[in-house]
Structures are given as C-alpha cells and as structure tokens.
Amino acid sequence: MTDPNPKGSTSKEGFGDWCLLEADCSDVENDLGQLFERDTDSDISDLLDDTELEQGNSLELFHQQECEQSEEQLQKLKRKYLSPKAIAQLSPRLESISLSPQQKSKRRLFAEQDSGLELTLNNEAEDVTPEVEVPAIDSRPDDEGGSGDVDIHYTSLLRSSNKKATLMAKFKESFGVGFNELTRQFKSHKTCCKDWVVSVYAVHDDLFESSKQLLQQHCDYIWVRGIGAMSLYLLCFKAGKNRGTVHKLITSMLNVHEQQILSEPPKLRNTAAALFWYKGCMGSGAFSHGPYPDWIAQQTILGHKSAEASTFDFSAMVQWAFDNHLLDEPDIAYQYARLAPEDANAVAWLAHNNQAKFVRECAAMVRFYKKGQMRDMSISEWIYTKINEVEGEGHWSDIVKFIRYQNINFIVFLTALKEFLHSVPKKNCILIYGPPNSGKSSFAMSLIRVLKGRVLSFVNSKSQFWLQPLSECKIALLDDVTDPCWVYMDTYLRNGLDGHYVSLDCKYRAPTQMKFPPLLLTSNINVHGEANYRYLHSRIRGFEFPNPFPMKADNTPQFELTDQSWKSFFTRLWTQLDLSDQEEEGEDGESQRAFQCSARSANEHL
C-alpha cells in the first residue's frame, strides 16, 4: 500500500502533484464475489456482436469476381492476337466488309441484374483508343508480277478467318473483276479439264518470272499477269488435268502453299470473259505464249467463218455420214458432236432443238444411198471397192495353204468360188461342213468381213422378216446350220437356192421381188449324205473340213485368215475368178468423181 503522505516519496522528482506515481489500493475490490456481481455495463458495450450470423450473398459475389477476371484475361488475348493492325495489313477495305447482315439492336425497357459481364465489356470498349495505321507500301509496281514483302502478305492471309473470300476480295481489288465472273465452278477436285484459270497470292518476283518459261512445256497457250500481290494465269494444258494436279504443279513451281491458290476452269461461252483475256494480253504488263484457244478466237476474232449463216444444213450432215460410212444413229450422233469444234454446221446442229430427229433422218438417208450404191455395183466393182478399203498388206498363200490343209483341191475350190460369186443358178450356195473346231466358221467369217456381207441367224426364224438382210448385201452367211434349219430350207428356200426371183417380205414395206445373193453355209451335217434332203443336193456345193484348225505354240493361228490375206488373194487371182477390169467398167470418158449428196453449189468457197 502507498503512503498517503506524499512527502515521504522522493523517487520521481519534477512531476509535481498532478501525476500519480502509484495507484491506490482498495480492499473492497479484493472481494471476488462483489466483483462479479457488480454491473459490467460500460460506455463501450456491444463492441462484439454475439448474435447468430447468416450466409448472405457471398457466393454470387465470388462468381461475379471470377467472371470479371476471366473476361479481363480473354480481352487481353484478343488484343494480342486479333489486333486491328492485322486487318489493316491484309486489306484496308476488308474491315468494312461483313459477311453476315447487321441486326438492329433492341432497346430494353428494364435493365436486368446479371453478373456484370456486359458492363465490363462496355467499359472496356469505351476505354479502347482507336489506332490509325498507314498501310504498308508494296515494293512491286502494280503491273508487274511477284511480291516485295511475301512474309507480310502470307501472315495476313493466315490471320484471316475466310481465306477464300479474302483472296477473292484481293483479286477483285487488283483486277477490277470478280474471279467467279471469269470462271465456272467445279465442285469435285477429280474433274479433268484442259483449260484452267489460276490466281496465286504473294509470289516471289524471281519465281513469277521463271514460271513464264517453265509453263511453256506443259501448255499450248499461256496468259500471265501480276497486279499488286495477285498473279493471274490462264493455262491451256496439252492434256486434261484435275484441280489436284494443277495445284501440285503450281505449288512446286512457285513455292507457295495451296491456301494461296484459287483455281477454276474458264467460262468458254461467255463473250465478256473471252474479251477480258483477249484485251488483257494487249497490255504492257501481260505475257502470253502460243496461239489463242478456239473458244477465245471464235468469240473475239472476226474471219470468213463469221460471215456464214448459222443455220443447220441437213445435206452437209448426210454427206459427212456417207463419206465416213456411218449407218447407225448412235455413231452418227456421237461422231458429229465431236466435229463441232471444227465444223460450223455441227455447231448449228448442236444448237438445234431437233437433234434426234435429224440423226434418225440422216441415218435413214445414208442407208438409202448405200443400198442404192450397192445395187448399182457389179460384184467385181463391189469386191474392188471393199478390198481397197483394207489397210496393210498380207499374203494370199495363207488361204491357199489352209484349203490344201483341209485336203481340198484348190483348183476345184477356185472354180466353185468363181461360180459362187457370179451367182450362177444352182451354183450360188457353198456349204462348208466338218467336225467341230475345224475352222469352218473362222474361214467363212473372214470372207464375209472383208466383203461387208450380212449374217443370218436361224434363231429369228419365227419372225417373217428374218431373211430381210439378204436384200441389203452382196454376200450372206448362215452359220452352223442344224436339222431344223435344213428342214426349213428344204421346205421354203428351194427357189432362192436355185438363183431365181423370190418374194421377200421386208418390214414396213410390201414384199420385194429379188434374187438371193451368194449364200455361204457352215454346218456339222453333210447334207449330201442325208437322203431326206435329196432335193438340196443339186442346189448346194459342199466342201469338207476334216482336220482341226492348227495352232502355234503361242496359241495363235498357224494360218492368218485376215482382211489383208483376202485382199492379196483377190488381187492375185482377179483374172482366175473372172472378175472384170475396173478401168473397163464404164463408158469412155466417164468421170470417176465421188458420190455427192449435199446441196452445196460448185462456186462456194472450200
């Protein structure tokens, strides 16, 4: 306890009486019971809140903070990789181009309470300061090929989301015309075409100039021009190529990526497109090599063909089919369509609406002319005409050796063949019989083939018109005659085998009066040994082929029964067969000009 008398304290001097150096002790406070029973209220009560706590909205606050942080990181990445500088480097005008239509914004009546993402974007958009950048100047003049800064162009192309649209925009900006206006689209990469339009972006100057020389070995015609970073090629290849082959050639030659290439075939029937290529080669910046393609020349260059009328001349089509020996409608249609690039009349036929009608009528007229020509010829003139159509040379000895191989006297056979060709009554039918695989059909078919004869089939005997081919040939063949056929011939064809006139029923026509042409038969049955067909013995001359057809070690025929062999046979034995000399066929001074069925006058240009 402190002394109540302050005079006895000398430890701290200089403080005066205002400072209490020791606290006074009270005995009353030593009682713990009274201390706890006393009221504990003070002026700073309720400093700690002992009430029950609630969760509140801390989870939503945490979610909002996470979204703001993620959006901030995303915006930093966008500013880093999608800078407006990249769009300006690629194309100054591309920034204003939008592929999707702009939708009008709708005004909201009530603002919704969301996570604050939209507010964050709006605030960041307001804070962005617009940047103005001057486009880089290309080191290459506008009308020269190549590119001064390839890396910049290629990098800007890679940053584009739609590379094809970007290339087309650059092409139109450079050449002033759309790429699709000059080309037609091939969806498949495997479709072949000889002509291709190729546009390449960002090519080195040296490679661009060297391509003008390297492409000449692959193409008949080359058109090349470069403006800015775009290079345009019109390539007419010597052979058809697909898009993959063209890209492989261009990428290896120009050292570019396939994404830098646009390639489509050109429009062949568009006059405006043809004029673009024709006028483009007249400029100083264009390079061309070779003659103009036909589709450009026909639409741009005037000549004597342009003065001709574009009407279709049916007689010219008939004359063409007659000269080329085309009788079937499919052959006439296909071959005449292929003639269109060379013949103006074929082009007019393709443009006509009645192509099928003209083809049917043309085939009918050619058959009429051929049939009339055949009837007007003698057998000597017919054989002379047909063997002259055979190309190449053979040896007649193969046929003679084969006849002797079958144990037939050649003089007897030659006499029978002479009477057979001249249709001597009861001598105009020859039968070749023998066992199978003896060469009967091969020998007969080779003779019919070289003389352009017709083949009859007994399988059509139920039809009353099955003998109609006899009215359209100079020689006929009935192969592999069996017993039913012999019965039919013994019953109905005796007059025809005699060489007399018969009434032959032809389709769509009245029965025709005519004689049978020389008829060649093959069979496994010797009709002369059958008593049932005794009335045919005097009408048919038979020769037996008893020996099998010989073959070489390499499984080829030992005797070549070809068209060339028969050509040599008839030429060698022309006199022995009693065939007339062709120089003595007509009257003296008669012209030997070819048959003309067209309506062209003599004073027209050739």
From Swiss-Prot:
Quaternary assembly: Can form hexamers. Interacts with E2 protein; this interaction increases E1 DNA binding specificity. Interacts with host DNA polymerase subunit POLA2. Interacts with host single stranded DNA-binding protein RPA1. Interacts with host TOP1; this interaction stimulates the enzymatic activity of TOP1.
Modified residues (Phosphoserine): S83, S91
GO terms assigned for molecular function: ATP binding; ATP hydrolysis activity; DNA binding; DNA helicase activity
Naturally occurring in which organism (per UniProt): Human papillomavirus type 5b
Primary role: ATP-dependent DNA 3'-5' helicase required for initiation of viral DNA replication. It forms a complex with the viral E2 protein. The E1-E2 complex binds to the replication origin which contains binding sites for both proteins. During the initial step, a dimer of E1 interacts with a dimer of protein E2 leading to a complex that binds the viral origin of replication with high specificity. Then, a second dimer of E1 displaces the E2 dimer in an ATP-dependent manner to form the E1 tetramer.
Subcellular location: Host nucleus
Region (DNA-binding region): 146-309
Assigned EC number: 5.6.2.4
Protein name: Replication protein E1
Pfam families: PPV_E1_C, PPV_E1_DBD, PPV_E1_N
PTM statement from Swiss-Prot or TrEMBL: Phosphorylated.
Residue positions of motif Nuclear export signal: 90-99
Placement of sequence motif Nuclear localization signal: 78-80
